[in-house]
Amino acid sequence: AKSAVVIGSGYIGAEIAEQFSVTGVKTTLVDGLDRPLANNFDKTITDQVAAAFEEHGVTLAFGQKVVEFRDNDDDTVTVVTEKGEYTAEMAILAVGFLPNTDLLKGKVDMLPNGAIVVDDYMQASAPGVYAAGDSATVFYNPTGQHDYIPLATNAVRQGLLVGRNIETPTVKYMGTQATSAVQLYDLSLATSGLTRAGAERRGLTVRETSLTEDYRPDFMLTTTPVTSILTWDPETRKVKGGQFCSKADISGAANVISMAIQAGFTID
Protein backbone atom coordinates (compact mmCIF):
# COMPACT_ATOMS: atom_id res chain seq x y z
CA ALA A 1 0.00 0.00 0.00
CA LYS A 2 1.10 3.55 -0.71
CA SER A 3 -1.26 5.25 1.75
CA ALA A 4 -2.86 4.41 5.09
CA VAL A 5 -5.05 5.89 7.78
CA VAL A 6 -4.29 4.69 11.30
CA ILE A 7 -7.08 5.20 13.84
CA GLY A 8 -5.79 5.37 17.40
CA SER A 9 -2.54 6.91 18.62
CA GLY A 10 -1.73 4.77 21.63
CA TYR A 11 1.39 2.60 21.60
CA ILE A 12 0.21 0.30 18.81
CA GLY A 13 -1.22 2.99 16.55
CA ALA A 14 1.79 5.26 17.04
CA GLU A 15 4.25 2.47 16.21
CA ILE A 16 2.27 1.47 13.11
CA ALA A 17 2.16 5.08 11.90
CA GLU A 18 5.89 5.46 12.51
CA GLN A 19 6.76 2.32 10.56
CA PHE A 20 4.51 3.27 7.66
CA SER A 21 6.06 6.73 7.45
CA VAL A 22 9.67 5.49 7.40
CA THR A 23 8.87 3.02 4.63
CA GLY A 24 7.36 5.61 2.30
CA VAL A 25 3.66 5.06 3.02
CA LYS A 26 1.64 8.29 3.05
CA THR A 27 0.20 8.15 6.57
CA THR A 28 -2.60 9.87 8.45
CA LEU A 29 -2.94 9.34 12.21
CA VAL A 30 -6.43 9.90 13.65
CA ASP A 31 -7.42 10.04 17.31
CA GLY A 32 -10.36 11.32 19.32
CA LEU A 33 -7.96 12.80 21.88
CA ASP A 34 -5.99 15.95 21.18
CA ARG A 35 -2.49 14.45 21.13
CA PRO A 36 -0.62 11.16 20.62
CA LEU A 37 0.02 8.79 23.53
CA ALA A 38 -2.28 10.98 25.65
CA ASN A 39 -3.02 8.17 28.11
CA ASN A 40 0.67 7.50 28.72
CA PHE A 41 2.51 10.83 28.75
CA ASP A 42 2.02 14.50 29.60
CA LYS A 43 1.76 17.18 26.93
CA THR A 44 5.37 18.29 27.44
CA ILE A 45 6.46 14.92 26.07
CA THR A 46 3.68 14.25 23.55
CA ASP A 47 4.40 17.61 21.88
CA GLN A 48 7.84 16.21 21.02
CA VAL A 49 6.22 13.05 19.63
CA ALA A 50 3.76 15.06 17.52
CA ALA A 51 6.61 17.15 16.13
CA ALA A 52 8.51 13.98 15.19
CA PHE A 53 5.47 12.64 13.33
CA GLU A 54 5.09 15.88 11.39
CA GLU A 55 8.80 15.97 10.56
CA HIS A 56 8.35 12.55 8.93
CA GLY A 57 5.33 13.60 6.89
CA VAL A 58 2.56 12.06 8.99
CA THR A 59 -0.73 13.97 8.81
CA LEU A 60 -2.10 14.39 12.33
CA ALA A 61 -5.88 14.44 12.74
CA PHE A 62 -6.36 14.70 16.49
CA GLY A 63 -9.49 15.64 18.41
CA GLN A 64 -11.56 13.83 15.79
CA LYS A 65 -13.86 10.87 16.38
CA VAL A 66 -14.48 8.50 13.47
CA VAL A 67 -18.13 8.35 12.42
CA GLU A 68 -18.02 6.30 9.21
CA PHE A 69 -15.92 4.11 6.91
CA ARG A 70 -16.77 4.40 3.22
CA ASP A 71 -15.57 1.93 0.57
CA ASN A 72 -14.75 3.48 -2.80
CA ASP A 73 -14.89 2.02 -6.31
CA ASP A 74 -11.11 2.37 -6.74
CA ASP A 75 -10.43 -0.01 -3.82
CA THR A 76 -9.64 2.82 -1.42
CA VAL A 77 -11.40 3.55 1.84
CA THR A 78 -12.48 6.93 3.18
CA VAL A 79 -12.39 7.46 6.92
CA VAL A 80 -14.99 10.07 7.85
CA THR A 81 -14.52 11.95 11.13
CA GLU A 82 -16.42 14.75 12.82
CA LYS A 83 -14.09 17.25 11.17
CA GLY A 84 -12.95 15.80 7.85
CA GLU A 85 -12.46 12.90 5.45
CA TYR A 86 -9.26 10.92 4.86
CA THR A 87 -8.90 8.55 1.92
CA ALA A 88 -6.23 5.86 1.67
CA GLU A 89 -5.61 2.35 0.39
CA MET A 90 -6.06 0.90 3.87
CA ALA A 91 -7.43 1.84 7.28
CA ILE A 92 -6.09 0.26 10.46
CA LEU A 93 -7.89 0.27 13.79
CA ALA A 94 -5.78 0.51 16.96
CA VAL A 95 -8.35 1.85 19.38
CA GLY A 96 -7.66 -0.09 22.56
CA PHE A 97 -8.92 -3.17 24.36
CA LEU A 98 -12.15 -4.48 25.84
CA PRO A 99 -12.32 -7.67 27.91
CA ASN A 100 -14.24 -10.44 26.14
CA THR A 101 -15.87 -11.76 29.30
CA ASP A 102 -19.60 -11.94 28.54
CA LEU A 103 -19.47 -15.67 29.33
CA LEU A 104 -19.03 -14.85 33.03
CA LYS A 105 -21.21 -11.75 33.28
CA GLY A 106 -23.28 -11.89 36.46
CA LYS A 107 -21.28 -14.84 37.77
CA VAL A 108 -18.12 -13.10 39.00
CA ASP A 109 -17.23 -9.59 40.13
CA MET A 110 -16.20 -7.30 37.27
CA LEU A 111 -15.28 -3.70 36.64
CA PRO A 112 -17.83 -1.71 34.60
CA ASN A 113 -15.85 -2.48 31.42
CA GLY A 114 -16.10 -6.25 31.99
CA ALA A 115 -12.63 -6.88 33.43
CA ILE A 116 -12.75 -9.76 35.92
CA VAL A 117 -11.69 -8.71 39.42
CA VAL A 118 -9.10 -11.14 40.78
CA ASP A 119 -7.44 -11.55 44.18
CA ASP A 120 -3.74 -11.87 45.00
CA TYR A 121 -3.73 -15.40 43.59
CA MET A 122 -5.57 -14.52 40.34
CA GLN A 123 -8.82 -16.13 41.52
CA ALA A 124 -12.15 -14.50 40.67
CA SER A 125 -15.00 -14.10 43.16
CA ALA A 126 -16.40 -17.52 42.17
CA PRO A 127 -14.50 -20.59 43.42
CA GLY A 128 -12.39 -22.33 40.80
CA VAL A 129 -12.43 -19.42 38.35
CA TYR A 130 -9.09 -17.79 37.52
CA ALA A 131 -8.36 -14.95 35.12
CA ALA A 132 -5.24 -13.36 33.67
CA GLY A 133 -4.16 -10.89 31.03
CA ASP A 134 -6.51 -8.66 29.09
CA SER A 135 -9.60 -10.27 30.65
CA ALA A 136 -8.57 -9.44 34.21
CA THR A 137 -7.86 -6.56 36.52
CA VAL A 138 -4.44 -5.81 37.94
CA PHE A 139 -3.62 -4.43 41.37
CA TYR A 140 -2.24 -0.99 40.53
CA ASN A 141 0.30 -0.07 43.19
CA PRO A 142 0.31 3.73 42.62
CA THR A 143 -3.37 3.86 43.65
CA GLY A 144 -3.70 0.73 45.77
CA GLN A 145 -6.77 -0.27 43.75
CA HIS A 146 -7.84 -2.75 41.11
CA ASP A 147 -7.53 -1.32 37.60
CA TYR A 148 -7.59 -2.40 33.98
CA ILE A 149 -4.16 -2.06 32.35
CA PRO A 150 -3.80 -4.43 29.38
CA LEU A 151 -0.03 -4.75 28.95
CA ALA A 152 1.84 -7.86 27.82
CA THR A 153 4.07 -7.71 30.90
CA ASN A 154 1.03 -7.90 33.17
CA ALA A 155 -0.46 -10.75 31.14
CA VAL A 156 2.72 -12.85 31.29
CA ARG A 157 3.10 -12.46 35.05
CA GLN A 158 -0.56 -13.14 35.74
CA GLY A 159 -0.53 -16.22 33.51
CA LEU A 160 2.45 -17.60 35.41
CA LEU A 161 0.68 -16.98 38.71
CA VAL A 162 -2.44 -18.81 37.55
CA GLY A 163 -0.27 -21.80 36.70
CA ARG A 164 1.43 -21.69 40.11
CA ASN A 165 -1.73 -21.12 42.14
CA ILE A 166 -4.48 -23.04 40.38
CA GLU A 167 -3.96 -26.15 42.52
CA THR A 168 -2.84 -24.53 45.77
CA PRO A 169 -2.57 -20.77 46.41
CA THR A 170 1.14 -20.25 47.06
CA VAL A 171 2.52 -17.20 45.23
CA LYS A 172 0.93 -13.77 45.66
CA TYR A 173 0.72 -11.12 42.96
CA MET A 174 2.93 -8.12 43.81
CA GLY A 175 0.88 -5.68 41.75
CA THR A 176 2.12 -3.50 38.93
CA GLN A 177 3.28 0.02 38.19
CA ALA A 178 2.39 -0.41 34.49
CA THR A 179 5.93 0.44 33.44
CA SER A 180 6.33 0.64 29.67
CA ALA A 181 8.57 2.11 26.99
CA VAL A 182 8.50 2.81 23.27
CA GLN A 183 10.91 4.03 20.60
CA LEU A 184 9.44 6.38 17.98
CA TYR A 185 11.90 7.60 15.36
CA ASP A 186 14.90 8.82 17.38
CA LEU A 187 12.89 9.43 20.54
CA SER A 188 13.07 7.02 23.47
CA LEU A 189 10.06 7.27 25.78
CA ALA A 190 9.40 5.48 29.07
CA THR A 191 6.82 5.78 31.82
CA SER A 192 5.89 4.17 35.12
CA GLY A 193 2.93 4.81 37.38
CA LEU A 194 0.57 7.77 37.28
CA THR A 195 0.60 10.83 35.09
CA ARG A 196 -1.29 13.93 36.19
CA ALA A 197 -4.09 13.17 33.72
CA GLY A 198 -4.22 9.56 34.89
CA ALA A 199 -4.54 10.70 38.49
CA GLU A 200 -7.30 13.16 37.63
CA ARG A 201 -9.28 10.44 35.83
CA ARG A 202 -9.16 8.43 39.05
CA GLY A 203 -10.14 11.36 41.26
CA LEU A 204 -6.68 11.66 42.83
CA THR A 205 -4.60 14.74 43.57
CA VAL A 206 -0.93 14.70 42.62
CA ARG A 207 1.81 17.19 41.93
CA GLU A 208 4.45 17.07 39.23
CA THR A 209 8.04 18.21 39.07
CA SER A 210 9.65 18.45 35.63
CA LEU A 211 13.21 18.96 34.49
CA THR A 212 14.99 19.06 31.15
CA GLU A 213 18.71 18.44 31.47
CA ASP A 214 21.49 16.78 29.47
CA TYR A 215 21.80 13.10 30.24
CA ARG A 216 25.53 13.39 30.87
CA PRO A 217 27.97 16.28 31.52
CA ASP A 218 28.67 18.87 28.82
CA PHE A 219 32.37 18.00 28.72
CA MET A 220 31.53 14.57 27.28
CA LEU A 221 31.91 14.28 23.51
CA THR A 222 28.21 13.58 22.99
CA THR A 223 25.17 14.36 25.09
CA THR A 224 21.49 15.12 24.55
CA PRO A 225 18.63 16.53 26.64
CA VAL A 226 16.32 14.36 28.74
CA THR A 227 12.84 15.51 29.72
CA SER A 228 11.91 14.04 33.11
CA ILE A 229 8.58 14.38 34.92
CA LEU A 230 8.10 13.08 38.47
CA THR A 231 4.58 12.62 39.87
CA TRP A 232 4.11 12.58 43.65
CA ASP A 233 1.45 12.68 46.36
CA PRO A 234 1.37 16.12 48.06
CA GLU A 235 0.19 14.62 51.39
CA THR A 236 2.42 11.57 51.78
CA ARG A 237 5.15 12.84 49.41
CA LYS A 238 5.34 9.31 48.00
CA VAL A 239 6.49 8.82 44.42
CA LYS A 240 3.50 7.99 42.22
CA GLY A 241 4.92 8.07 38.70
CA GLY A 242 7.60 9.18 36.29
CA GLN A 243 7.96 9.93 32.58
CA PHE A 244 11.04 10.31 30.41
CA CYS A 245 11.79 11.37 26.84
CA SER A 246 15.14 11.71 25.10
CA LYS A 247 17.16 10.78 22.05
CA ALA A 248 19.27 8.76 24.48
CA ASP A 249 18.00 5.40 25.69
CA ILE A 250 16.35 6.30 29.00
CA SER A 251 14.14 3.22 29.34
CA GLY A 252 16.03 2.09 32.43
CA ALA A 253 15.01 5.25 34.29
CA ALA A 254 11.39 4.09 34.35
CA ASN A 255 12.49 0.91 36.14
CA VAL A 256 14.01 3.03 38.91
CA ILE A 257 10.71 4.90 39.31
CA SER A 258 8.85 1.58 39.30
CA MET A 259 11.01 0.32 42.15
CA ALA A 260 10.45 3.56 44.08
CA ILE A 261 6.66 3.24 43.75
CA GLN A 262 6.70 -0.45 44.72
CA ALA A 263 8.83 0.29 47.79
CA GLY A 264 6.79 3.33 48.86
CA PHE A 265 9.71 5.77 48.58
CA THR A 266 9.11 9.50 49.10
CA ILE A 267 10.62 12.38 47.15
CA ASP A 268 12.72 13.20 50.22
Q: What does each model-found stretch correspond to?
A:
Residues 250, 257-268:
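Helix-rich C-terminal "cap"/substrate-channel and partner-interaction subdomain
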Residues 135-248:
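Mid-to-C-terminal Rossmann-like scaffold of FAD/NAD(P)H-dependent oxidoreductases
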Residues 59-61, 130, 207-209:
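General small-molecule cofactor/ligand-binding pocket signal
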